[in-house]
């Protein structure tokens, strides 16, 4: 019988967890896009996050909150505007910035999706106890810090000519 090698097991688990982030995102998008009728999963997320602000957020704020580029958010917002779900208006603070304001039609979509949202959360977390959800929430916060460390690591590698 081989001796137990914790280091190998931990490294393997890190690799699985890392790739799992991508797999989980892909699965979530594929499932939701298959069943959402009027908008994509990403468009819905942009609307829900924009609606959470007291005042319409600008594209850069949404990009930062959603972890993607401003250009990506603009592309999603333009398609939502064409469908009548949002209005893109110049920021009062900076006329060069565009703010995403949810229209009445968009608010209707968000309101109608609240039941869906409950079912999504209920399904995804069905096998979790409240304690496990609290722990997962805590660990997700640590993972978010890890993304910051990863960004710094890549930046330093690039500055040092390692990339």
Language-model segment annotations:
Residues 16-19, 48-49, 140:
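Hydrophobic alpha-helical segments that form the core
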Residues 78-141:
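Charged, amphipathic alpha-helical coiled-coil/dimerization segments
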């Amino acid at each position: 019988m081989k001796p137990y090698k914790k280091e190998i097991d931990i490294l393997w688990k890190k690799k699985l967890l890392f790739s799992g982030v991508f797999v989980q995102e892909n699965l979530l998008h594929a499932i939701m896009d298959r069943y959402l009728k009027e908008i994509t999963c990403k468009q819905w997320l942009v609307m829900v996050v924009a609606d959470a602000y007291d005042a319409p957020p600008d594209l850069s704020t949404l990009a930062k909150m959603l972890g993607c580029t401003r250009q990506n958010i603009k592309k999603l917002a333009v398609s939502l505007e064409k469908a009548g779900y949002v209005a893109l208006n110049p920021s009062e603070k900076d006329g060069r910035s565009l703010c995403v304001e949810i229209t009445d039609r968009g608010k209707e979509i968000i309101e109608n999706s609240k039941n869906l949202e409950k079912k999504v959360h209920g399904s995804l977390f069905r096998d979790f106890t409240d304690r496990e959800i609290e722990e997962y929430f805590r660990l997700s916060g640590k993972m978010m810090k890890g993304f910051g460390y990863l960004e710094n690591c890549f930046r330093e590698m690039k500055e040092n000519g390692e990339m």
